[in-house]
């Protein structure tokens, strides 16, 4: 089981990298919006399928607002676990005594922020519409990636951090709900190419799988110590 989990992480990493390269290189055509600054039409990879789906899924302000505001709720999980960590620090007065899964979460959040910043600089393609009088980086869908990473990590970490079963169940239901609503509404909003959503799912799946490996290792160590 342990070996299979690590292999799955590697497979997902390779899939995310290969897919990103393919998006940047395969079937790249100028089907995106015109750059207001240069007057040049932006190019997009997998243009045939992206163009087909974009024509079916025009911009929908309702789904856009849903993905935007429900996405904000995901940061409630970050605040929740940060609060638990702070409470543990106040009680135990020793950083080393804080639950190691909380530390793993903190490091994971930093990694997510780094990946987010990386793709803001490394522009693979631009959004299918101009929303702020300028082209915006579109790959991967940051809302998709953040929702899956934040909510998915909560699902994995809650069993080690939240001892109250009822609260844990509520957290997990909320995590699944927010994650699904954001991903689906982001696709239906029409503010991303189809491959942006897929890329976001692949990248975040690798990150969540790897985080899960870390959590399982911590849990095993804690069980052995007890």
Name each region found by the language model.
Residues 57-59, 63-66, 79-95:
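Membrane-helix interface/capping segments
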Residues 14, 18, 103-118, 149, ...:
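Hydrophobic, lipid-facing residues on alpha-helical transmembrane segments of integral membrane proteins
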Residues 12, 70-77, 109, 113, ...:
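Hydrophobic alpha-helical transmembrane segments of polytopic
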Residues 4-7, 128-226:
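Membrane-embedded catalytic cores of phosphoryl/pyrophosphoryl-handling enzymes
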Residues 2-77, 120-131:
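N-terminal transmembrane-helix/juxtamembrane module of multi-pass inner/ER membrane proteins
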Residues 2, 6, 62-65, 98, ...:
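Hydrophobic, aromatic-rich alpha-helical transmembrane segments
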Residues 17-21, 112-115, 177-187:
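Aromatic-anchored segments of alpha-helical transmembrane domains
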Residues 28-39, 83-171:
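Membrane-interface loops
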């Amino acid at each position: 089981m342990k070996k299979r989990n690590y292999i799955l992480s590697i497979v997902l990493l390779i899939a995310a990298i290969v897919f990103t390269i393919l998006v940047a290189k395969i079937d790249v055509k100028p089907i995106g919006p015109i750059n207001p600054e240069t007057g040049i039409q932006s190019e997009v990879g997998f243009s045939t399928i992206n163009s087909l789906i974009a024509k079916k899924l025009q911009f929908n302000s309702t789904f856009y607002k849903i993905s935007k505001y429900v996405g904000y709720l995901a940061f409630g999980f970050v605040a929740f676990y940060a609060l638990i960590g702070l409470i543990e620090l106040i009680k135990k007065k020793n950083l080393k005594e804080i639950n190691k899964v909380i530390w793993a979460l903190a490091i994971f959040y930093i990694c997510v922020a780094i990946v987010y910043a990386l793709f803001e600089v490394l522009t693979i393609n631009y959004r299918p519409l101009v929303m702020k009088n300028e082209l915006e980086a579109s790959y991967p869908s940051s809302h998709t990636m953040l929702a899956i990473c934040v909510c998915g990590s909560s699902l994995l970490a809650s069993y080690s951090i939240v001892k109250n079963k009822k609260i844990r169940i509520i957290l997990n239901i909320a995590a699944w709900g927010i994650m699904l609503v954001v991903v689906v509404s982001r696709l239906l909003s029409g503010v991303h190419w189809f491959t942006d959503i897929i890329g976001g799912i692949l990248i975040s799946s690798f990150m969540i799988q790897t985080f899960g490996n870390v959590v399982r290792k911590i849990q095993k160590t804690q069980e052995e110590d007890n």
